[in-house]
Structures are given as structure tokens and as C-alpha cells.
């Protein structure tokens, strides 16, 4: 039987689409759901929506580009907090940190997303490829002190667990390496966690 495309192939198709792709989020966009949303050109969510990368709670890290795209949107510091805590962020905060671009009405998400898309087309707005966005990470390139301080701040809570440290190493790679190299770091460390003894 023919095999469907892999998640990574789907993400590439979304990111490289010549038509605007908007992720319309309701409920929760967690883990892989958020990782797919991060490949879309824009994100819109209802007020009750929540987003997060909770893999660390299972002894894992986001394995579909989440650690590489997230800091390119929200910056290294917020990305570090999100991947090491696994917290679910409410829509209002997602908007404040730039994770989503607009809040829709609770009962008209589809209509609002279509309206949002038509404005993008009408105003000829760029189709944002998150993986190419260096703007939010450039000031942290080579800033080892940021990562050292962050490691210290969570040391007591995470002692003995590999996943928080590997998540930090992935964000560090996102900040300091080209996207494709960072993805390789993420996949290697993800594999180590999946095959190790600490993952659920």
C-alpha cells in the first residue's frame, strides 16, 4: 500500500506553500499540534485556546521542529521557559509573546481565519517562513550567559532528569546554528530520549 507523507514532509509543504496557510486554533494546540501550527505562515486562535510543548513532562522534547521554530517566534528566554516547564499558555499571552497573530471570536473562528487570510492576500503581506526568521534570536547568538543562568534557575527542579537539559541544548542550537543543523541536534537528542530509560 502507498505510504502517506511523513509529518516532516507535510510541514515542508505547509511552509513552502505559495498560498497563505493560517493555523486556526481552538481547544489546545499542544506538542505536535503546535509544531504543525508553527510551520504555518500565520496563527489565529479563539480566546479559550491554549498552546504549549508539554513533551518534557513525558521525559521527551518536541521532535518535529518545535525547539527550532519556537525561539524564532518568541525569543530564546520564553522558548526556554515553555519547553522546560511544558506549561499551557492561554491565547491572550500567546498573542502578547507573538506566538499567535490574532485572537478570533470564540464562535466564528473559521470566518475570522478566512477574513484574516483575505487581508493577507489583499495587502500582499509576506508568507512568513518561521525557519528563516532570525530576528527574534539574533541578539542571543553567542550569549552563553543566558543559557548558564537559565540552567541555574531550574537546576533544583530538574536535577537528575535528561529531558530539561536536552530541551535547553536544542534551544541553544536554534539560537546558534543554522536551522537545518539545529533540526539535526533536535532529532539526535529526541532519539536519545525516546530510546532511553526516562521517557514515559
Question: What kind of region is each of these model predictions?
Answer:
Residues 1-26, 66-68, 73, 199-200:
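An acidic, glycine-rich surface segment that forms the CoA-thioester-binding/catalytic face
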Residues 4, 8, 31, 88:
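Glycine-rich phosphate-binding loop at the start of an alpha helix
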Residues 14-58, 62:
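Glycine-rich beta-to-alpha active-site loop
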Residues 35-39, 83-189:
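Amphipathic alpha-helical segments at domain termini/boundaries
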Residues 70, 78-87:
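Short helix- or helix-capping micro-motifs
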Residues 191-200:
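Long amphipathic alpha-helix in the N-terminal Rossmann-like dinucleotide-binding domain
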Amino acid at each position: 500500500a502507498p505510504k502517506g507523507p511523513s509529518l516532516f514532509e507535510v510541514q515542508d509543504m505547509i511552509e513552502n506553500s505559495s498560498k497563505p496557510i493560517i493555523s486556526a486554533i481552538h481547544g489546545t494546540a499542544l506538542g505536535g499540534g503546535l509544531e504543525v501550527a508553527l510551520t504555518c505562515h500565520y496563527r489565529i486562535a479563539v480566546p479559550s485556546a491554549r498552546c504549549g510543548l508539554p513533551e518534557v513532562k513525558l521525559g521527551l522534547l518536541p521532535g518535529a521542529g518545535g525547539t527550532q521554530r519556537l525561539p524564532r517566534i518568541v525569543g530564546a528566554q520564553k522558548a526556554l521557559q515553555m519547553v522546560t516547564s511544558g506549561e499551557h499558555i492561554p491565547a491572550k499571552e500567546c498573542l502578547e509573546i507573538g506566538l499567535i497573530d490574532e485572537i478570533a471570536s470564540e464562535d466564528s473562528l473559521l470566518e475570522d481565519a478566512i477574513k484574516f487570510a483575505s487581508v493577507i492576500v489583499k495587502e500582499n503581506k509576506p508568507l512568513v517562513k518561521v525557519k528563516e526568521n532570525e530576528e527574534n534570536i539574533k541578539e542571543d547568538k553567542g550569549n552563553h550567559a543566558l543559557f548558564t543562568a537559565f540552567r541555574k534557575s531550574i537546576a533544583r527542579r530538574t536535577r537528575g532528569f535528561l529531558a530539561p537539559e536536552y530541551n535547553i541544548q536544542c534551544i541553544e542550537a536554534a539560537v546558534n546554528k543554522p536551522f537545518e543543523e539545529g533540526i539535526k541536534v533536535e532529532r539526535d537528542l529526541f532519539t536519545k530520549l525516546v530510546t532511553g530509560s526516562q521517557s514515559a
